Swiss-Prot record:
GO terms for biological process: cell morphogenesis; cell wall organization; lipid A biosynthetic process; peptidoglycan biosynthetic process; regulation of cell shape; UDP-N-acetylglucosamine biosynthetic process. This is Bifunctional protein GlmU. It comes from Burkholderia thailandensis (strain ATCC 700388 / DSM 13276 / CCUG 48851 / CIP 106301 / E264). Mg(2+) binds at D100, N223. The gene is glmU. GO terms for cellular component: cytoplasm; membrane. Homotrimer. In the N-terminal section; belongs to the N-acetylglucosamine-1-phosphate uridyltransferase family. Pfam families: Hexapep (PF00132), NTP_transf_3 (PF12804).
């Protein structure tokens, strides 16, 4: 089967410089969702028709299995499909999809394709309580489809019809090519409508078959930011329902956003207002607190991420505790039972088994061993303005508060670092390291008093 995706429209109502089909739904372009659905049908040819913002669209979705046809002027859906014809296999039927209709299930499209075999032309329709704005399916007394009429060209009686055309069709490619070549543009818009092919198919003796989706929202398109927001909520609701069905506990299914792939084990609990981006894995018994953002992370069994924490490219071992208000950046790796607390940032660093950095700390480009206690206010000074250097802290080190490690530096096993120390040279195993300081107390000091105006 050939699949053609129409993605050339200007999207004026979006009021955006970004091509409509590149606006994100669940963190990915609308068009990417449609391409994924198309791939699930294993097409022999997959062609995307581009026009407005063509090069941006091409760059966003380019892949070895995707071909592109360009519609230089937006002259209607029939004209758009015509641009794809040279790239299609004429011996296979063609399914036409839309880059701004992202939620159609592959199973729905498979049903339509299966119905439109031999000398049949398949149309996906849906019955709406309010069909305003859509092309109507006109049937004769026997229930056979006779034509599809657009809203602007419909009579008063035709406007009362509730069954509408979604625009998604399947047709035999060789005949479709002939029909498209014969299209006219004698209509209110002066465009070449793909829907007008139906009358030609009937005249050629083709039966018009219709199927409907299981859910109305499968056929909803995006023409405005309001519609995009509506589809986002529908999509997120379906994702939340799938998580609940898999046994995940959601404090409020209406307040979770999945913008990628979220894989959960047993007894996972997710509090409100959490966002998951990219590829995220939560193993058995993981607990995620409220208002967390987690991107491209793997979190092992029994771990806990407390509220307002941000994880990006991080790996957490079993029974780790993170947050609240922690930030783990790419390359952060926490071994089993490690703790990273409030206002701690970890970047390109490892924290060994049972090690803890519980308060107000920056650990960047560091290798920290097991059972290390990192005191509040500790900083790894990893950057000289041009180059990054690593700090190595071996097992069983105790780091006092307000300590700076000036990399590159290595601190040996079992070292104790006194509070307020700046470590800029390597420290041998088992040593106490501190900076000599004196404390002066002066009597008779009078603190200045601010004058009142």
């Amino acid at each position: 089967m050939n699949i053609v995706i129409l993605a050339a429209g200007t999207g004026k109502r979006m009021r955006s410089a970004l091509p409509k089909v590149l606006h994100p739904l669940a963190g990915r372009p609308l068009l990417s969702h449609v391409i994924d659905t198309a791939r699930a049908l294993a097409p022999s040819r997959l062609v995307v028709v581009i026009g407005h913002g063509a090069e941006r669209v091409r760059a966003a979705v380019a892949a070895p299995d995707v071909q592109f046809a360009v519609q230089e002027q937006q002259l209607g859906t029939g004209h758009a499909v015509r641009q794809a014809l040279p790239l299609l296999d004429p011996s296979q039927p063609t399914l036409v999809l839309y880059g701004d209709v992202p939620l159609t299930r592959a199973a729905t499209l498979r049903r339509l394709a299966d119905a439109a075999t031999d000398a049949r032309y398949g149309v996906l329709t849906v019955t709406l309580d309010d069909p305003t704005g859509y092309g109507r399916i006109v049937r004769d007394q026997a229930g056979c489809v006779t034509r599809i009429v657009e809203q602007k060209d419909a009579s008063a009686d035709e406007l009362k019809i509730a069954e509408i055309n979604t625009g998604i069709v399947v047709a035999p490619t060789a005949q479709l090519s002939m029909w498209l070549g014969a299209l006219g543009n004698d209509n209110a818009q002066g465009e070449y409508y793909l829907t007008d092919v139906v009358e030609q198919a009937i005249e050629a003796g083709f039966e018009i078959v219709t199927t409907q989706p299981d859910d109305e929202w499968e056929t909803l398109g995006v023409n405005s930011k309001a519609q995009l927001a509506e589809l986002e909520r529908i999509h997120q609701r379906k994702l939340a329902e799938a998580l609940l069905a898999d046994g995940v506990t959601l404090a409020d299914p209406a307040r979770i956003d999945v913008r990628g792939k979220l894989t959960c084990g047993r007894d996972v609990s997710i509090d409100v207002n959490c966002v998951f981006e990219g590829d995220v894995t939560l193993a058995d018994g993981v607990t995620i607190g409220a208002n967390c953002v987690i991107r491209n992370a793997a979190i092992a069994a029994g771990a806990r991420v407390d509220a307002f924490s941000h994880l990006d490219g991080a790996t957490l071992g079993a029974n780790t505790v993170v947050g609240p208000y922690a930030r783990l950046r790419p390359g952060a790796v926490l071994a089993d039972d490690a703790h990273v607390g409030n206002f701690v940032e970890v970047k390109n660093a490892t924290l060994g088994h049972g090690s803890k950095a519980n308060h107000l700390t920056y650990l960047g480009d560091a290798d920290i061993g097991a059972r290390v206690n990192v005191g509040a206010g500790t900083i790894t000074c990893n950057y000289d303005g041009a180059n990054k250097f690593r700090t190595v802290i071996e097992d069983d080190v105790f780091v006092g508060s307000d300590t700076q490690f000036v990399a590159p530096v290595r601190v040996g096993r079992g070292v104790t670092v006194a509070a307020g120390t700046t470590v800029w040279k390597d420290v041998a195993e088992g040593m106490l390291v501190l900076n000599d300081k004196t404390q002066t107390a002066k009597s008779g000091y009078v603190r200045p008093v601010k004058k009142k105006s």
